[in-house]
Each structure stands twice: as structure tokens, then as C-alpha cells.
């Protein structure tokens, strides 16, 4: 939980930034911008302050060795740790369950929680694979992350047609994962 004094200090910092950028703080359109910006950043980084969602498991009721479970194109939003600009992600996950399977919504919530923080996509993909292996109690995991980074989409090289794709695997799971580009901007 963020204290009121910390929020006030953050809002003042945004006011200073807006003035630095040349904005007129008396303009009606930006009257509440510092408050809105701080609230938006708190939402985008909630994974830093909130515990991970609890995962509910359902027992497998058959004797056969279960095949892999694949969940493709989970939409999540993160922010670049270098520029604090949004990264729109599509995350695909495959895992080999052990003796029970987690609820589908819990896997999706776990991915969205993990993304809700400043990240570098390459490191995030590795961490997410470790996190899912542990939290899903899986025998093996494969993760594929496709990201559109606003730091190179709207500034710098200004290339709206690229996406970054990263993959990580824990164990011997050999599954092809699809991962669509998160934004189609043609």
C-alpha cells in the first residue's frame, strides 16, 4: 500500500516534470494529470506491491501421463525499465502438469501479475519460466513472449512494424508456441 504522503510527493514530481517539458500547469486539460499519471503508473506496476495470485489446482482423474497444456496469446501490459513506456505483450505458455492442473484463469492472472512491473523482456521471459514452473507445480514449462515496445515504436527508431520475440524453456517440453504480434498497426 502506498502512503498518501508518497503519492503527494510523486504527484509533485510529475508537476515538476511537466513544467520542465514546457507545460502550463494552469491549463484545464492538465489540472489532474499528475494524479492520473501516478495512478496509471501504480496500476502498471502493481506486481511490485501485490502478492502473486493464488493458484487453485484440480486433480487429474486418470492414470495416463498427461500431455502438455498450451495457453496462447495471453495479453498483458508492462513498462520498459529503461524509459517507463508501455510494452504490449502476448505471452504463450505450455506446461507439463504433474499430478494436478491449475485453473486456466489463474495461469492468465499469474502472467498478467508478473508483467505488471518495469521489465527488460529478455530477463522477464526467463523469470516468467521459473515462476510458472514453481507456481504451476509443472514438470516442465515453455514460454514465448512477443512484445511491442513503445520506447522504439514512438521514439528513438520510431518503427511501428517490429516486435520482439523471446523464448525460454525449463525441462524437456518440446511444443511449438504461436505468438501473434500484440498490435496490428498497418
Provide a role label for each language-model segment.
Residues 1-186:
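A domain-level signal for the structural core that forms small-molecule/cofactor-binding pockets
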Amino acid at each position: 500500500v502506498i502512503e498518501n504522503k508518497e503519492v503527494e510527493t510523486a504527484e509533485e514530481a510529475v508537476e515538476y516534470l511537466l513544467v520542465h517539458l514546457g507545460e502550463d500547469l494552469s491549463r484545464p486539460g492538465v489540472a489532474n494529470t499528475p494524479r492520473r499519471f501516478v495512478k496509471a503508473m501504480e496500476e502498471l506496476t502493481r506486481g511490485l506491491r501485490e502478492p502473486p495470485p493464488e493458484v487453485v489446482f484440480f486433480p487429474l482423474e486418470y492414470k495416463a501421463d498427461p500431455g502438455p497444456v498450451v495457453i496462447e496469446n495471453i495479453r498483458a501490459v508492462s513498462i520498459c525499465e529503461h524509459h517507463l513506456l508501455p510494452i504490449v505483450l502476448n505471452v504463450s505458455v505450455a506446461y507439463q502438469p504433474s499430478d494436478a492442473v491449475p485453473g486456466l484463469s489463474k495461469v492468465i492472472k499469474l502472467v498478467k501479475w508478473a508483467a505488471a512491473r518495469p521489465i527488460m523482456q529478455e530477463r522477464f521471459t526467463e523469470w516468467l519460466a521459473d515462476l510458472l514452473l514453481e507456481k504451476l507445480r509443472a514438470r516442465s514449462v515453455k514460454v514465448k513472449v512477443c512484445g511491442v515496445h513503445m520506447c522504439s515504436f514512438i521514439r528513438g527508431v520510431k518503427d511501428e512494424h517490429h516486435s520482439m520475440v523471446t523464448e525460454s524453456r525449463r525441462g524437456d517440453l518440446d511444443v511449438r508456441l504461436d505468438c501473434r504480434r500484440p498490435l496490428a498497426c498497418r
